[in-house]
Design a protein with these regions (language model features):
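ABC ATPase "signature
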Residues: 254-255, 263
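Conserved H-loop
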Residues: 223-229
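ABC family nucleotide-binding domain
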Residues: 30-219
């Protein structure tokens, strides 16, 4: 659901950016666009308070694709809703572009929030409006003229590959097409950050791949910071630069995707990345088990054969797989 009138970035500001051709944000991987400092969130229930988040400390950099992963109930969706203040944190602070959201006036907070587009697992399209009208909707709320809103919506629908479906209604679209409309709508007001809460969970693998490629294209070509919330490691390895693993309301570990995949330090990290292999209780007596990682497109050196010759011990390969992480 979109907020009411006045809850969108000022139309004059939005279209100054558009008319001047200014990209929402240039990539700068050294500085944070979002900082979470000691963030906590509790919900009050009939049985007492329930802690959803506790002492969350994160920095998300300009222009990166940042993943937040965890099992169901870990707190990841609450975290993303605290980032844009759809949920008000119980403790700690959210700093957006150097400004603390918790001390902002309501108008400033609304403008900051509208610099963060959001897409969900459920597409939340308006069934009585066609594709073009759905994308125009947030601009209409902002008081943007119909002509300007239509022009912006047409540009975005072309970007997401739906230029031939503008007059179609949500009921006539596939799941992937609906999510593309939702992405276009989330970008209507030129956000600096795109929050994706389980955006591919309801899609089939091929459609998921195409949506992830679209998000990466938006990140690469427009410089928009993308935050991906998911429970699927395949999504993280396909699109993200860095990742935070959340477990039982806490951050378990944070790092570059390649580093986390190569050597997860937390129990939940090993569970998510290694899966069944980490849980196997293999009994080989005093034999050692060694994990070998080839970091690159190919390995021409016969490492296993050389190990056998050098150590003069037999070697069994118990498990092997290949993954494409950061193009490697």
């Amino acid at each position: 659901m979109w907020p009411g009138r006045g809850h969108v970035r000022d139309p004059e500001y939005v279209f100054q950016e558009q008319k001047k051709g200014i990209k929402p944000m240039e990539a700068n991987n050294e500085n944070p666009i979002i900082q979470l400092v000691g963030l906590g969130k509790q919900f009050q229930t009939m049985n007492g308070p329930v802690t959803a988040l506790e002492d969350i400390n994160l920095e998300i950099r300009y222009g990166e694709v940042f993943g937040i992963i965890g099992l169901s109930g870990a707190g990841k969706s609450t975290l993303v809703r605290c980032i844009n203040y759809l949920e008000v944190p119980t403790s700690g602070k959210v700093v957006f572009e150097g400004k603390n959201l918790s001390v902002m006036k309501d108008r400033e907070k609304r403008l900051a929030r509208q610099s963060m587009g959001m897409i969900f697992q459920q597409f939340n399209l308006l069934s009585q409006r066609n594709v073009l009208q759905n994308v125009c909707f947030p601009l209409e709320i902002a008081g943007v003229s119909k002509a300007e809103a239509k022009k912006r919506a047409e540009e975005l629908l072309t970007l997401v590959g739906l230029e031939d479906r503008m007059k179609a209604y949500p009921a006539q679209l596939s799941g992937g097409q609906k999510q593309r409309v939702a992405i276009a709508r989330a970008m209507a007001t030129n956000p600096k950050v795109l929050l994706c809460d389980e955006a591919t969970s309801a899609l089939d693998p091929n459609t998921t791949k195409s949506i992830l490629e679209l998000l990466k294209k938006i990140n690469r070509e427009m410089g928009i910071t993308v935050i991906v919330i998911t429970h699927e490691m395949a999504v993280i390895e396909a699109i993200c630069d860095r990742v935070a693993i959340i477990d039982h309301s806490h951050i378990a570990e944070v790092g570059n995707v390649s580093d986390i995949f190569s050597g997860p330090k937390s129990d939940i990290g090993r569970q998510l990345i290694l899966g069944d292999v980490a849980e196997q209780n293999l009994n080989f007596g005093n034999s050692r088990q060694i994990r070998i990682i080839f970091d690159g497109r190919e390995s021409s050196e016969p490492v296993i054969a050389n190990m056998v010759l050098a150590c003069k011990v037999p070697v069994n390969i118990m498990h092997a797989d290949t993954r494409d992480i950061e193009g490697k």
